[in-house]
Regions:
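Active-site metal-binding motif and surrounding structural segment of the metallo-beta-lactamase
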Residues: 1-17, 79-84, 106
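Binuclear metal-ion centers of metallo-dependent hydrolases, dominated by the metallo-beta-lactamase
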Residues: 14-22, 76, 97-99, 103-142
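Short, charged, surface-exposed secondary-structure boundary motifs
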Residues: 7-11, 26-31, 43-45, 92-99, ...
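Core dinuclear metal-dependent hydrolase active-site scaffold
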Residues: 18-78, 93, 142
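Active-site-proximal segments of metal-dependent phosphoesterases and phosphodiesterases across multiple
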Residues: 82-103
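Active-site neighborhood of phospho(di)ester-bond hydrolases with catalytic His/Asp-centered motifs
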Residues: 1-2, 64-67, 83-88, 110-114, ...
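Short histidine/acidic/glycine/proline-rich micro-motifs that form metal-
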Residues: 39, 88-90, 115-119
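Alpha-helix C-terminal capping segments
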Residues: 6-10, 56-57, 74-79, 130-133
Length: 142
């Protein structure tokens, strides 16, 4: 679990805050909400593991960091200004699936992630960008 991994890295128990899906939290003055992050077609990230993405509220904007996930019945309800969404495929959505997801939730800005190292390429990010509605700004960072 993430908790165990944090302990192995040297964090103390009092430094670790456990979260569960579908909850709102406030930590050190920051408000955030957890969103279930899981795969629908594969079992790399099963729903039963209770992994999450986050919606952070910073100033007057909301930022969704999806985590390793596919489009699913939980995250399709996300409302945000900026979304960070995986496009690399295999362990997460591929570029086509990610574009379908982002076109559904309609953030103002999207940043494709989870490509270019382990899986996926810059071409995946570019393909993703080409499939977005013209009302959604895409920022490819690498």
């Amino acid at each position: 679990s993430g908790y165990t991994e944090c302990l192995k890295m040297g964090f103390k128990e009092h430094q670790i805050n456990r979260v569960v899906p579908n909850k709102r939290y406030q930590l050190h003055g920051m408000n955030f909400e957890t969103v279930p992050a899981y795969n629908v077609k594969s079992q790399y990230h099963p729903k039963s593991s209770n992994w999450v993405g986050y919606i952070l509220e910073i100033r007057s904007a909301s930022y969704y960091i999806s985590g390793d996930t596919d489009m699913n019945e939980d995250n399709v309800l996300v409302e945000c200004d900026v979304a960070f969404v995986p496009v690399g495929g295999i362990y997460t959505m591929d570029s086509v699936e990610a574009a379908k997801f982002v076109n559904e939730i309609q953030p103002r800005i999207v940043v494709p992630i989870h490509y270019g190292a382990i899986v996926g390429t810059k071409q995946d990010a570019e393909r993703f960008e080409g499939l977005l509605r013209n009302t959604i700004e895409c920022r490819i960072m690498m």
